[in-house]
Each structure stands twice: as structure tokens, then as C-alpha cells.
């Protein structure tokens, strides 16, 4: 370990604090906004959008009119 003492040109000791190494702690990757969650959310949104388009093509009408026709 490095000592925090130096001697200047006049022979006087200069004691100073040694700064610790800065360590960036990674956030907990199991919760919150992180790359894995954002990618999963985007992929699920794309799958849902494609499923909606395929449903509209198969039924010949939009999803909202189809749901409204079932209510009447």
C-alpha cells in the first residue's frame, strides 16, 4: 500500500489522504429499467402488434368493430 507521506524540498513532511479507488457498483439487474427488460418489452410489443394485424386480416375487419359486434 502506498504511503501518504511526502517530503518537500525543505525536509518537511507532508501528510495527505490517499483517495480510494472509485468502484462503480452495477445496479441490481433483476428489477427496474435495464437493457434486458427493455428488449423483452419491445419484442413482446412487436409480437402483439403482428398478432393484431393477423387477427384483422383473418376476420376481415378491425378488432374494435369485431368486439363491438359481439356486444350487440
Curated annotation (Swiss-Prot):
It comes from Synechococcus elongatus (strain ATCC 33912 / PCC 7942 / FACHB-805) (Anacystis nidulans R2). A high light-inducible protein involved in photosystem II (PSII) assembly and/or repair under stress. Binds chlorophyll and carotenoids, protecting against photo-oxidation during PSII assembly. It is a single-pass membrane protein. The chain crosses the membrane at residues 47-67. Forms homodimers that associate with PSII assembly intermediates containing CP47 (psbB). It is found in: Cellular thylakoid membrane. GO terms for biological process: photosynthesis. Belongs to the Hlip family. One of its GO terms (cellular component) is plasma membrane-derived thylakoid membrane. The gene is hliA. Its main location: membrane. It comes from the Bacteria. Induction: Transcription is highly up-regulated 15 minutes after a shift to high light (500 umol photons/m(2)/s), declines by 2 hours to low levels. Upon a shift to low light (50 umol photons/m(2)/s) transcripts are rapidly degraded. Also transcribed in response to blue and UV-A light. This is High light-inducible protein HliA. One of its GO terms (molecular function) is pigment binding. Keywords: Membrane, Photosynthesis, Photosystem II, Pigment, Stress response, Thylakoid, Transmembrane, Transmembrane helix.
Amino acid at each position: 500500500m502506498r504511503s501518504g507521506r511526502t517530503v518537500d524540498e525543505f525536509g518537511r513532511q507532508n501528510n495527505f489522504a490517499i483517495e480510494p479507488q472509485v468502484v462503480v457498483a452495477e445496479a441490481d439487474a433483476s428489477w427496474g429499467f435495464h437493457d434486458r427488460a427493455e428488449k423483452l418489452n419491445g419484442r413482446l410489443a412487436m409480437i402483439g402488434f403482428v398478432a393484431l394485424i393477423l387477427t384483422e386480416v383473418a376476420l376481415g375487419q378491425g378488432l374494435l368493430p369485431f368486439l363491438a359486434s359481439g356486444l350487440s
